[in-house]
């Protein structure tokens, strides 16, 4: 296969190598799936010696196909039969449906194993449409019934998104979209199918709409009831994971958070005046035993969906960019709680920062955050039996760790938003 994958992949939203210089992009394995559809595992190497593997499905056509879209065109290949056009096959509804049929019939093709979960039905005849919502993966929606998520960057080992969704589904927890199937090689997971949450709304969109209403009207939109229900949902998922996979005791991850603080302070010099106090807060917890179990790992308002019936937690892959073994390591459920609390602050203050808000707007944003934090924690406590704020110093440390990460990110990519985590850091260390 002689396609210039490197020229195409660097422009994809899911490409993770933007901070590195690409050296090569070569197919490591190609599996023909029929009807001009090839499955490609692409090895990408960088000039600093780092390597990673991506998954691409290639649809070959004898002529340009405008309906796939310009971004789907990978390149062309010339041979005895003339020029062929290579497209990202997930933009071809027929190719996406071919994948779903392979999963439905639990077939094996070459090194690829497709598996349907027991006692489920896949909508193999439903129309397929690629979703534009995701960044690190690509999803295809089949009617109103199922969603196929194709992992773009693939890593050897057990994928936590499939693993935890399977555990939760088999335990009967209703707070996740039911796992319907998956596909993999002998060494790594490649994709999964879940029930599609039709007529759902993302938590981030709902929260920011509430804040917008608050700033536009004296009464404002109240999100507190939804926050309470979300707290109940998160606690329910935590309880199921703890019951199904067990709990243990570990020390607070002092080395990890201190390493992150050092790296973040280099990226965001604004952190330097606060670094000693942040480090002091972390060191207070050194050797502190905490209860841990498997958790979501990267929970925020963009990872939850509100259906007409309830809240659902999605995307259990863990924190992007972290090694797979770290993403599968048991952690305190307070990490997930801290992620939601940080997300409340972002929902409220991003409109203050981007809209040039005054002190009154900031005060109202703080009031909105406090009200929703109270509601979320009350909902969590109603299921878990204890308010997460009862472990206030540990929860604050996880919030600080998250805010430190956010400060580094904003300093690199979105400097105008840096005041959001800096405001929180100042509050948490005061």
UniProtKB/Swiss-Prot annotation:
Give the pathway annotation.
Glycan biosynthesis; glycogen biosynthesis
Key word Nucleotide-binding present: yes
Molecular function terms, GO-annotated: ATP binding; kinase activity
Recorded E.C. number(s)?
2.7.1.175
**A Pfam family recorded for this sequence:** Mak_N_cap
Catalytic activity field: D-maltose + ATP = alpha-maltose 1-phosphate + ADP + H(+)
Which biological process terms from the Gene Ontology are attached to this UniProt entry? carbohydrate phosphorylation; glycogen biosynthetic process; trehalose biosynthetic process
Protein family membership:
Belongs to the aminoglycoside phosphotransferase family.
- Described function: Catalyzes the ATP-dependent phosphorylation of maltose to maltose 1-phosphate. Is involved in a branched alpha-glucan biosynthetic pathway from trehalose, together with TreS, GlgE and GlgB.
Name of the protein this chain belongs to: Maltokinase
At the highest ranks, the source species' classification is: Bacteria, Bacillati, Actinomycetota, Actinomycetes, Mycobacteriales
């Amino acid at each position: 296969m002689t396609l210039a994958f490197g020229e195409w992949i660097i422009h994809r939203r899911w490409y993770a190598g933007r901070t590195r210089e690409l050296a090569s992009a070569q197919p490591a394995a190609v599996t023909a799936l029929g009807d001009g559809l090839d499955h490609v595992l692409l090895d990408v190497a960088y000039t600093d010696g780092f390597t990673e593997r991506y998954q691409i499905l290639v649809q070959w056509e004898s002529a340009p196909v405008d309906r796939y879209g310009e971004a789907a065109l990978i390149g062309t290949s010339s041979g005895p039969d003339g020029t062929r056009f290579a497209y990202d096959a997930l933009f071809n509804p027929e190719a996406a449906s071919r994948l779903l049929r392979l999963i439905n019939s639990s077939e094996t093709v070459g090194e690829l194993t497709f598996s349907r979960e027991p006692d489920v039905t896949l909508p193999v005849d439903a129309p397929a449409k690629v979703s534009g919502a995701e960044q690190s993966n690509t999803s295809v929606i089949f009617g109103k019934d199922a969603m196929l998520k194709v992992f773009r960057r693939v890593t050897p080992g057990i994928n936590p998104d499939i693993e935890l969704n399977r555990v939760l589904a088999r335990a009967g927890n209703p707070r996740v979209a039911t796992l319907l199937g998956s596909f993999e090689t002998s060494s790594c997971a490649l994709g999964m199918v879940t029930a599609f949450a039709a007529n759902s709304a993302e938590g981030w969109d709902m929260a920011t709409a509430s804040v917008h209403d608050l700033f536009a009207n004296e009464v404002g939109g109240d999100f507190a009831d939804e926050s309470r229900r979300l707290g109940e949902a998160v606690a329910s998922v935590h309880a199921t994971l703890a019951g199904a996979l067990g709990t243990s005791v570990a020390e607070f991850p002092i080395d990890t958070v201190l390493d992150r603080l050092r790296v973040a302070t280099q990226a965001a010099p604004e952190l330097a005046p606060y670094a000693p106090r942040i480090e002091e807060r972390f060191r207070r917890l050194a050797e502190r035993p905490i209860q841990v179990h498997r958790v979501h790992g990267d929970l925020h308002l963009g990872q939850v969906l509100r259906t007409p019936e309830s809240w659902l937690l999605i995307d259990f892959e863990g924190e992007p960019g972290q090694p797979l073994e770290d993403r599968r390591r048991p952690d305190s459920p307070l990490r997930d709680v801290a992620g939601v609390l940080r997300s409340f602050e972002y929902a409220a203050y991003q409109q203050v920062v981007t809209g040039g808000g005054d002190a009154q707007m900031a005060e109202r944003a703080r009031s909105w955050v406090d009200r929703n934090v109270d509601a979320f924690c009350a909902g969590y406590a109603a299921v878990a039996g204890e308010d997460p704020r009862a472990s206030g110093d540990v929860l604050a440390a996880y919030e600080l760790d998250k805010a430190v990460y956010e400060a580094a990110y904003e300093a690199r990519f979105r400097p105008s938003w840096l005041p959001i985590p800096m405001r929180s850091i100042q509050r948490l260390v005061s």
